[in-house]
Amino acid sequence: MALLKSKPTSPGKRGEIRVVHHDIYKGKPHAALVEKLKKTGGRNNQGRITVRHIGGGQRQKYRIIDFKRNKDGILGRVERLEYDPNRTALIALISYKDGEKRYIIAPSNLEVGATIQSGADSPISVGNCLPLKNIPVGTTIHCVEMKPGKGAQMLRSAGCSGQLVAKEGVYATLRLRSGEMRKIHVLCRAVIGEVSNSEHNLRALGKAGAKRWRGIRPTVRGVAMNPVDHPHGGGEGRTSGGRHPVSPWGLPTKGYKTRSNKRTDTFIVRGRKKK
C-alpha cells in the first residue's frame, strides 16, 4: 500500500492523492458472488427524494460478503485480494477445503496464500473468526456481531478496529475507536485484526468530477437557497442565515443529539469522546 501524489498537469491532478495497492487482483470478480445493483438516485418507490446528494456515477456490481463466517472447522485459503467499489475496505476471496468460495472483509496484513478458519477452536491469528468468549482480553478485533448469528455489523470500514477490554458473565466490553465502551454478548463473533486499507482517509479526490463518478451529488448551502427550500433561504444579498443552524426540515444541527434509542442505552458503558 502506498500514497501516490500526482504531478500537477491540471488543476484536478494538483490536489489528487491516490492510495495504490500493488498486491491487488486486477481481473473481474468471482461471478457466483456478484449481484446486480440498481441505481436509485436517492428516490423511494414513490419517486420522492429520501436521501439527498445521491445520483449518477459509474455502474457497480454488488459483491456478496460473508459477514456470518459460519463455516466452522473448515480451513480456507486466501486466493486473492480485490477492490470493492461498494465499501472502503478491500475484500478477500477465500477458497475453502470443501470447494466453496466466499468473500470476506480483508484484514490488514492478510496475505495471498494465508489460511483462515472460523469457530471456537480457531487459533488467535489475523483473519480468524471466533466467539468473543474465546478471544483473550486485550485483542484487537473487527467485524463484530451485535446479535449472535446475525452477522457482523460493527467495525467494518477501512482501518476500523476495536479492543476487547473485559469479559463479565454473558457480556464482553469493547472499546471502539470513538472512545465508546459497549457491552456485546459473548456468543457474538468477531474477527481478529484490523480492517485493511487504513490509509483510505488520507486520499484526496482532487476534483468535483471524482465525487460524481462515485455517485455523490453536490451539497448546496441553505443560505444560498430560496425561502421555500430552506429555513436559511432568502434575503437581499448575501446573508448569514439569521438563526441557529438548522436542517432543511427545521431541526437543529451542529451538535444536536438525535439518538432516541433508549432501549439499548444499557449496553453503552461509556459514551463517545467529545471532539
UniProtKB/Swiss-Prot annotation:
GO terms for biological process: cytoplasmic translation. Pfam families: Ribosomal_L2, Ribosomal_L2_C. SMART domains: Ribosomal_L2, Ribosomal_L2_C. GO terms for cellular component: large ribosomal subunit. Residues 223-260 are annotated as: Disordered. One of its GO terms (molecular function) is rRNA binding. It comes from the Bacteria. InterPro entries: NA-bd_OB-fold, Rib_uL2_dom2, Ribosomal_uL2, Ribosomal_uL2_bac/org-type, Ribosomal_uL2_C, Ribosomal_uL2_CS, Ribosomal_uL2_dom3, Ribosomal_uL2_RNA-bd_dom. Keywords: Ribonucleoprotein, Ribosomal protein, RNA-binding, rRNA-binding. NCBIfam families: rplB_bact. Part of the 50S ribosomal subunit. Forms a bridge to the 30S subunit in the 70S ribosome. Belongs to the universal ribosomal protein uL2 family. PANTHER family: LARGE RIBOSOMAL SUBUNIT PROTEIN UL2M (PTHR13691:SF5), RIBOSOMAL PROTEIN L2 (PTHR13691). One of the primary rRNA binding proteins. Required for association of the 30S and 50S subunits to form the 70S ribosome, for tRNA binding and peptide bond formation. It has been suggested to have peptidyltransferase activity; this is somewhat controversial. Makes several contacts with the 16S rRNA in the 70S ribosome. This is Large ribosomal subunit protein uL2. It comes from Legionella pneumophila subsp. pneumophila (strain Philadelphia 1 / ATCC 33152 / DSM 7513).
